[in-house]
Amino acid sequence: MVRVRFAPSPTGFLHVGGARTALFNFLFARKEKGKFILRIEDTDLERSEREYEEKLMESLRWLGLLWDEGPDVGGDHGPYRQSERVEIYREHAERLVKEGKAYYVYAYPEEIEEMREKLLSEGKAPHYSQEMFEKFDTPERRREYEEKGLRPAVFFKMPRKDYVLNDVVKGEVVFKTGAIGDFVIMRSNGLPTYNFACVVDDMLMEITHVIRGDDHLSNTLRQLALYEAFEKAPPVFAHVSTILGPDGKKLSKRHGATSVEAFRDMGYLPEALVNYLALLGWSHPEGKELLTLEELISSFSLDRLSPNPAIFDPQKLKWMNGYYLRNMPIEKLAELAKPFFEKAGIKIIDEEYFKKVLEITKERVEVLSEFPEESRFFFEDPAPVEIPEEMKEVFSQLKEELQNVRWTMEEITPVFKKVLKQHGVKPKEFYMTLRRVLTGREEGPELVNIIPLLGKEIFLRRIERSLGG
């Protein structure tokens, strides 16, 4: 059975790059009728926070990427937080030491750093070996460690050989002998390093495919060596391309919003974000761009992942969001849009009126947060607009003639035409002025939609105010 995992660190909000990784894993698991596992990599105790773990889960749920096993739902391969698995890592490290594939190091971190700096100053790569650390392994040092309650670090003996990775996306990647030296797998604080914890977890959780960003490609050499040491076949690796900003540089905060939470707060829809992220580094066999989650699952395959960097285009995401927003049932749209109106200080009293406003304005809106300003004039009188002198009589007469008219465009339009003809006013100039009087804006939805919905009382009141009444 296919088993994949998404393994974020709870050190901040879910970045769109992480969300895309989670999405690709989720789609592959669902397509192959496999399992999608959520694992929390929280061994960086200083930066990891349970609050961020909750936020990460909240963002994944909002996107609709639900996991089969994880810290909150459990499963047969737990615990699913690395901080709760420390004893497991220790046992596996000790096993490697017993088998002569790893060794204890009694050097203090600052001594290791000194060695590193010395190697660099001599123009050598900072590669470590067991011989370099032997001088620190003395009875005195061991006693010191014991008295201080410290554990020796554990270093892995890196075999001197080439390693070949057949990556689903990158193709054949060869790691040459001597690319790295021995490396730490358990620190003296008793916690595992990223690569070691990752391999132990993937082995024990029976992960079959590792789909992740290509910034992890450099970690793969260490991981392949560890799988070999444990005499386990590595999973299938698929390193997906980096997401770049419009300027071709790695996507970061300087490009604007980059977290799922920020996009949600701006009024983006999960359907749109999922659809857009899926197309960053993957393409539909028929080139389709607008795809539901179900369509993404049925058409997803790893062989359509591109090795080329993907460009994050905020305008395309916005366009796509507009499409989903306009095609949403009006009840759901009203439910999602309402908090944005409340935040803008607009109180919704009449639900049916609110839905009609959304129907009229949605063609001009691409994200939920744009609705309040686009439709504020339906709920509040705009500032009075001065009517040009040559049109004041037109508006005065209209105000009188429309008092007793039934409030439909079929009844209103003939009155407009009659009054304009009497005064010899060009329709274009009149309608532009009328729009400003009613909405306080130069552009917006069609007046034929605005006028009936505003109602006679508001229509006449706004003309009265602009005439100085």
UniProtKB/Swiss-Prot annotation:
This is Glutamate--tRNA ligase 1. It catalyses: tRNA(Glu) + L-glutamate + ATP = L-glutamyl-tRNA(Glu) + AMP + diphosphate. It comes from Thermotoga maritima (strain ATCC 43589 / DSM 3109 / JCM 10099 / NBRC 100826 / MSB8). The keyword Transmembrane does not apply. Monomer. A motif ('KMSKS' region) lies at residues 250-254. ATP binds at residue 253. One of its GO terms (cellular component) is cytosol. InterPro entries: aa-tRNA-synth_I_cd-bd (IPR045462), aa-tRNA-synth_I_codon-bd_sub2 (IPR020751), aa-tRNA-synth_I_CS (IPR001412), aa_tRNA-synth_I_cd-bd_sf (IPR008925), Glu-tRNA-ligase_bac/mito (IPR004527), Glu-tRNA-synth_I_codon-bd_sub1 (IPR020752), Glu/Gln-tRNA-synth (IPR000924), Glu/Gln-tRNA-synth_Ib_cat-dom (IPR020058). It is an enzyme of class 6 (ligase). Keywords: Aminoacyl-tRNA synthetase, ATP-binding, Cytoplasm, Ligase, Nucleotide-binding, Protein biosynthesis. A motif ('HIGH' region) lies at residues 8-18.
